[in-house]
Amino acid sequence: MYSRLFYLKSSYIIYFEPLFSNAIINILSFINSLASPLTIFCFALSAQALSTIFYFRIFIFIFHSWILLFHFYFTCSFKTYEHQHSKMVPAYRMQSPRALPRTYLYVWPYK
């Protein structure tokens, strides 16, 4: 039903959405919407200019693959959380000693 970030000892789930504010999610979603056409343009431009040099070809391939994976990851991560904020009710919350003040880690029981 909901996407899960990771499991804690197979009995608890930490969801991705409560750890970040809506503002951060919206900014990353906006950047993600620009990523695909910008990636294609930059890759085509750099590949045409540097394709004669072998090491640059390897670099372009790795860099382009990383951008595509980044784009795919955020597309999958944020798409399911756009309209689900009111449906998610935590079982309990903990305050992390390493987190900012008034920042809580919400944990849901695994069902």
Curated annotation (Swiss-Prot):
Keywords, ordered alphabetically: Membrane, Transmembrane, Transmembrane helix
GO cellular component: membrane
Subcellular location(s) per record: Membrane
Membrane topology: Multi-pass membrane protein
Signal peptide bounds: none
Superkingdom as given in the UniProt entry: Eukaryota
Tissue occurrence: Brain. In the hippocampus it is mainly localized in the granular-cell layer of the dentate gyrus and in the CA2-CA3 subfields of Ammon's horn.
Chief location category: membrane
Protein name: Putative transmembrane protein CXorf1
Organism in which the protein naturally occurs: Homo sapiens (Human)
